[in-house]
Amino acid sequence: MEYSTFGKHIIVDLWGVDFSLLDDMHFLEYHLVTAADYSGAHVLNVSKKEFQPYGVTVLVLLSESHLSIHTYPEQNFAAIDCYTCGTTVEPQIAIDYIVNILKPERMHIKRLIRGIGEIVTAD
């Protein structure tokens, strides 16, 4: 069986997010796994790390690639990354879910199409 190299990659910077949400590893893990499920992805594993004095990284390994968040609560900032291979998963659904939960004051987003030769911006 030959697999397609096509993939969608969405990177997001969130600013103005509540400190307590960004420093709660279990809250973020639950919502990233839920977001992955809603997008149609298959969760394989979750790796997470709390940093001192603040901050969290959660990486959700997907059969289709990954979903991650890195937080800087003291700056009310989160960086989210979602890359999915193939056409069966829609990463925008995962991103929309997370943004709705975190309610940032502002957001910067880039959507990329990968695996078709040149990396193409989908915005």
UniProtKB/Swiss-Prot annotation:
Record organism: Bacillus cereus (strain ATCC 14579 / DSM 31 / CCUG 7414 / JCM 2152 / NBRC 15305 / NCIMB 9373 / NCTC 2599 / NRRL B-3711)
Q: Which reaction does it catalyse?
A: S-adenosyl-L-methionine + H(+) = S-adenosyl 3-(methylsulfanyl)propylamine + CO2
Q: How is it modified after translation?
A: Is synthesized initially as an inactive proenzyme. Formation of the active enzyme involves a self-maturation process in which the active site pyruvoyl group is generated from an internal serine residue via an autocatalytic post-translational modification. Two non-identical subunits are generated from the proenzyme in this reaction, and the pyruvate is formed at the N-terminus of the alpha chain, which is derived from the carboxyl end of the proenzyme.
Q: Protein name, please?
A: S-adenosylmethionine decarboxylase proenzyme 2
**Annotated metabolic or biological route of this protein:** Amine and polyamine biosynthesis; S-adenosylmethioninamine biosynthesis; S-adenosylmethioninamine from S-adenosyl-L-methionine: step 1/1
Which residue positions does Pyruvic acid (Ser) occur at?
65
Taxonomic lineage per UniProt? Bacteria, Bacillati, Bacillota, Bacilli, Bacillales
Under Gene3D superfamilies, the record lists:
3.30.160.750, S-adenosylmethionine decarboxylase domain
- Does the keyword Phosphoprotein feature in the UniProt annotation? no
In this chain's numbering, which residues are marked as the site (Cleavage (non-hydrolytic))? 64-65
Q: What is its EC number?
A: 4.1.1.50
Q: What class of enzyme is it?
A: lyase
Keywords for this entry? Answer: Autocatalytic cleavage, Decarboxylase, Lyase, Polyamine biosynthesis, Pyruvate, S-adenosyl-L-methionine, Schiff base, Spermidine biosynthesis, Zymogen
Indicate the family of this protein: Belongs to the prokaryotic AdoMetDC family. Type 1 subfamily.
